Structures are given as C-alpha cells and as structure tokens.
Amino acid sequence: VFCRFNGQQCTSDGQCCYGKCRTAFMGKICM
C-alpha cells in the first residue's frame, strides 16, 4: 500500500502519510 502526501487527494480508505484526510472544496485531500 502507498500513502498520499499533504495536498494530494485521499484514497478511498483515507490513508495519508501525514495529517488526516479532510474535505476541501476540491474534494478530499490530506492535510
């Protein structure tokens, strides 16, 4: 499995390298 960096869109399970998956105006991104 790979994780998403901050500023990238979250995967369906919301796995982020750092921070958390949050809903933004452009969809769900890692912050």
Curated annotation (Swiss-Prot):
Pfam families: Toxin_29 (PF08116). This is U13-ctenitoxin-Pn1b. The keyword Disulfide bond applies. It comes from Phoneutria nigriventer. GO terms for cellular component: extracellular region. Keywords: Disulfide bond, Knottin, Neurotoxin, Secreted, Toxin. One of its GO terms (molecular function) is toxin activity. The keyword Disulfide bond applies. Disulfide bonds join 3-17, 10-21, 16-30. It comes from the Eukaryota. It is found in: Secreted. Belongs to the neurotoxin 17 (21C2) family. The lineage of its organism: Eukaryota, Metazoa, Ecdysozoa, Arthropoda, Chelicerata. The presence of a 'disulfide through disulfide knot' structurally defines this protein as a knottin. Expressed by the venom gland. InterPro entries: Toxin_29 (IPR012634). Acts as a neurotoxin.
